[in-house]
C-alpha cells in the first residue's frame, strides 16, 4: 500500500537492525485517516471471503481491525492480554511471545464471542516472528472457527513469521513488506496488495 509505505518513510524510525518505530501513526498515536484507508484495503482484499468476524490482539491491532470490521460491516473482537473480573465465561486461551516486548503473554477471548463456523479475518499491526498471529489462529481453532485470512499492516519479511504462516496454509496479506533496513532506511519488498494500488 503506497500510502502506508510513504508514511513509514516519513514518520517511521529504524532502531537497530530489526525494530521499526511507528508510534507517530500506529503504535502510540493513531492516524485515524490512515487506519481507515488500511481497513478499507483489507476489506477490499477479503471482500469475497465471507468474513463474519474480525479478530486482533490488543493494543496496536485494534485501530486497523476496527476499520476493517467497519468496512466489512462485521463485529471486531480483540484478544485481551489480561483477564479482568468481568471475563467470567468460558475462555479461549493461548500464549503468545512478543518480539518487540521480549515477553510471553497469555491472551484470551470469551468463547461466547466466536462461534463454530465463523469466518474470521485476523488483523495485526506487525508480523515479525508470527507468534501473535499463530496464537490468534490457535484461539480460532479452539472455537472451531475458520481463519479465512490474515491481514498485517507491516511485515518484517526478513524474519520468519511469513513463512510460518504460509507453512500453515494461511492466506496472508501484508500492506507493507520490509525487505531490510539499510543505513537507517527502510527497503520495501513488493506488498501483497500491490494490485489494489
Curated annotation (Swiss-Prot):
The keyword Repressor does not apply. It is an enzyme of class 2 (transferase). GO terms for biological process: purine ribonucleoside salvage; xanthine metabolic process; XMP salvage. Pfam families: Pribosyltran (PF00156). Converts the preformed base xanthine, a product of nucleic acid breakdown, to xanthosine 5'-monophosphate (XMP), so it can be reused for RNA or DNA synthesis. GO terms for molecular function: xanthine phosphoribosyltransferase activity. Belongs to the purine/pyrimidine phosphoribosyltransferase family. Xpt subfamily. HAMAP family: XPRTase. It is found in: Cytoplasm. This is Xanthine phosphoribosyltransferase. Homodimer. Keywords: Cytoplasm, Glycosyltransferase, Purine salvage, Transferase. It comes from Lactococcus lactis subsp. lactis (strain IL1403). Pathway: Purine metabolism; XMP biosynthesis via salvage pathway; XMP from xanthine: step 1/1. The keyword Signal does not apply. Transmembrane segments: none annotated. 5-phospho-alpha-D-ribose 1-diphosphate binds at residues 128-132. It catalyses: XMP + diphosphate = xanthine + 5-phospho-alpha-D-ribose 1-diphosphate. Xanthine binds at residues 20, 27, 156.
Amino acid at each position: 500500500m503506497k500510502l502506508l509505505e510513504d508514511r513509514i518513510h516519513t514518520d517511521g524510525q529504524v532502531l537497530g537492525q530489526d525494530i521499526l518505530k511507528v508510534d507517530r501513526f500506529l503504535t502510540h498515536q493513531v492516524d485515524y485517516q490512515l487506519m481507515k484507508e488500511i481497513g478499507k484495503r483489507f476489506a477490499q482484499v477479503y471482500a469475497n471471503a465471507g468474513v463474519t468476524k474480525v479478530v486482533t490482539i490488543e493494543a496496536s491491532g485494534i485501530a486497523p481491525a476496527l476499520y476493517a470490521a467497519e468496512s466489512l460491516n462485521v463485529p471486531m473482537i480483540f484478544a485481551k492480554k489480561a483477564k479482568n473480573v468481568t471475563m467470567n465465561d468460558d475462555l479461549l486461551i493461548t500464549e503468545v511471545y512478543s518480539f518487540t516486548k521480549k515477553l510471553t503473554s497469555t491472551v484470551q477471548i470469551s468463547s461466547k464471542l466466536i462461534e463454530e463456523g465463523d469466518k474470521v479475518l485476523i488483523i495485526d499491526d506487525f508480523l515479525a516472528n508470527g507468534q501473535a498471529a499463530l496464537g490468534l489462529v490457535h484461539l480460532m481453532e479452539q472455537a472451531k472457527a475458520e481463519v479465512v485470512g490474515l491481514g498485517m499492516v507491516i511485515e518484517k519479511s526478513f524474519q520468519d513469521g511469513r513463512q510460518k504462516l504460509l507453512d500453515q496454509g494461511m492466506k496472508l496479506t501484508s500492506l507493507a513488506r520490509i525487505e531490510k533496513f539499510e543505513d537507517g532506511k527502510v527497503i520495501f519488498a513488493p506488498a501483497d496488495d500491490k494490485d489494489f494500488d
